[in-house]
Amino acid sequence: MSESKPTLRREQIASMNIHYIMWSLDYFLDVQQRLGFESIELWCAEPHVTLDHTGYFEAEVLAKKAADRGLRYRTLCPENVVYPWQYCARKPLHEQRSLAYFKHGIELAEVLGCDRMSVNSGWGDWDEDREEAWKRSREHMSILAEYAGEHGLVLTMESLRPEESNLVTTVSDAKRMIDEVASPYLQPMVDTTAMGVAGETLEDWFAAFGDGAIHEMHFIDGDPYGHLVWGDGKHDMEISD
């Protein structure tokens, strides 16, 4: 009798509202309830969530919207690619406001009962030395990981595509950053689009970090670019026994 392969269970999946930016948060949550999902990765940007460097807002409203539908927020994802805050901000005022923004994200995640907040390395200026930018990103990750630990959370760090960052864009970059920060509150996360663009596989990530180290991923297909429905792209999802 052949051994059955592991299957992905619906309760393992946290749906994400970034795909519903043109709809209200109520509409998104209604759809997730109807589809039978149980948990949410909350992307924090308007028109769904108000979060900035001055604080977080309407946490009670957000919590009630999920609870009324039998849903829970499992991960919080503060927008930082198209918004003015990023993890490797160089200018002092930008750095100060970015760190404040992400700390408020951690606080909101705690209030909403999340287990994790998803992060990335940010990016250095293209005209500065990469290692100098790397040091700054590492310092900021260390500050935020410590703050996350104080609030009962773990940060999960994904890689980015080369046009999004000149820092962590590969599994080896992610391994280096996480090893150098050396905090139990900073853990790896796989983004399958960045993984596919880098020509990597899930096996590469599991081999780099070991069994049980990866608890979260952005699970999407691509060609290798794009954010496609699973099966519409070409990402390698085969895992050896």
How would you describe each model-predicted region?
Residues 1-36, 63, 67, 113, ...:
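Histidine-acidic metal/acid-base catalytic patches
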Residues 18, 51-52, 95, 134, ...:
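A generic secondary-structure micro-motif detector
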Residues 66-74:
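Glycine-rich, aromatic-flanked loop segments that form ligand/cofactor-binding clefts
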Residues 48-51, 74, 82-86:
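Short active-site-adjacent helix-start/loop capping segments
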Residues 3-6, 27, 68, 85-187, ...:
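Active-site acidic/histidine proton-transfer and metal-coordination neighborhood
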Residues 43-66, 121-128, 228:
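Glycine-rich, proline-tolerant flexible connector loops at the mouths of alpha/beta enzymes
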Residues 19-21, 44-46, 79-82, 121-125, ...:
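Active-site-proximal loop/turn and secondary-structure-junction residues that shape catalytic pockets
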